[in-house]
């Protein structure tokens, strides 16, 4: 099948597009790029893979997915090697085509009603004290999947009530009010939604989302559940300026976000948005200094920091980036 014919072919339920097929319609300057050489401060530790294979085997048995695998997270060896994982619910097919993300795009399958129970059983079997639950975007669902999130929270609390739960949600367009009310009623310990990048880059990097909508989601949730910590994350190295990042940090704080993560964007494939630059550790320290001065309760800022990286320590206020107050 020719490339033109592939582009015109209707995506069927269950189809998952990745790489060039996924990002073909995104208005990017470069549709295909090479990779920049990584600087010395970008390092990924690779431990023995016995624990990694054990966790993967358990997840496949329970028909579960992790964002660690689907999004090609560079910290997968460290997190899996330490016996932790971020679970990705509602399948592995996303209804959005973000230029930075390696999760597949397409028409998702129906929700698995047994997934919340399987997730809770895996949390119990892995002995997790802290679990992060995230998802693909599900624009095909009336509530964006909020009730499925809530059922996952209920099932985990039923089996392991001592486990702390963080949810990393999509933006719930266009069902913000419904989703927020559902998740305010069945609340996690941390409500996380990533702003991802500065507003000036949304058209090219996050074309299916709206910057102000994401800010409104975070503020609305905090208004309904002031007892629950709110959290958001920013990627840098996509072409933004220092001043734009500072403004985004300030926007998050003025929208009542408590915790923030700032990390280096790494290109998942040659078809994704290219790395504009590798941000020096000193710049991450400056972002952290500003964030601390603005009053965030937890700041994680460093090249390898990701939203879910050592999320348990972030929740406790432990520094997992570069900045030392």
UniProtKB/Swiss-Prot annotation:
Q: Which Gene3D superfamilies match?
A: Aldolase class I
Q: How is the cofactor bound?
A: Binds 2 [4Fe-4S] clusters per subunit. One cluster is coordinated with 3 cysteines and an exchangeable S-adenosyl-L-methionine.
Report which gene this protein is encoded by.
Answer: lipA
Tell me its cofactors. Answer: [4Fe-4S] cluster
Q: Which family does it belong to?
A: Belongs to the radical SAM superfamily. Lipoyl synthase family.
The annotated pathway is: Protein modification; protein lipoylation via endogenous pathway; protein N(6)-(lipoyl)lysine from octanoyl-[acyl-carrier-protein]: step 2/2
Kindly list the positions annotated as binding [4Fe-4S] cluster 1.
Answer: 68, 73, 79, 308
Q: Which GO terms describe its molecular function?
A: 4 iron, 4 sulfur cluster binding; lipoate synthase activity; metal ion binding
Superkingdom of origin: Bacteria
Keyword Nuclease attached: no
Where are the disulfide bridges? Answer: none
Q: Does the keyword Iron apply?
A: yes
User: Where's it found, cell-wise?
Assistant: Cytoplasm
Which keywords does this Swiss-Prot/TrEMBL entry list?
A: 4Fe-4S, Cytoplasm, Iron, Iron-sulfur, Metal-binding, S-adenosyl-L-methionine, Transferase
Which CDD domains does the protein's record reference?
Radical_SAM
Could you tell me the EC number(s) of this protein?
2.8.1.8
The record's GO CC annotations read: cytoplasm
Q: Top-down, what is the taxonomic lineage of the species of origin?
A: Bacteria, Pseudomonadati, Pseudomonadota, Gammaproteobacteria, Oceanospirillales
Q: Which residues bind [4Fe-4S] cluster 2?
A: 94, 98, 101
Where in the numbering of this chain does the Radical SAM core domain appear? 80-297
Q: What class of enzyme is it?
A: transferase
Write out the catalysed reaction.
[[Fe-S] cluster scaffold protein carrying a second [4Fe-4S](2+) cluster] + N(6)-octanoyl-L-lysyl-[protein] + 2 oxidized [2Fe-2S]-[ferredoxin] + 2 S-adenosyl-L-methionine + 4 H(+) = [[Fe-S] cluster scaffold protein] + N(6)-[(R)-dihydrolipoyl]-L-lysyl-[protein] + 4 Fe(3+) + 2 hydrogen sulfide + 2 5'-deoxyadenosine + 2 L-methionine + 2 reduced [2Fe-2S]-[ferredoxin]
UniProt protein name: Lipoyl synthase
Report the source organism: Alcanivorax borkumensis (strain ATCC 700651 / DSM 11573 / NCIMB 13689 / SK2)
- Which SUPFAM superfamilies does this one have? Radical SAM enzymes
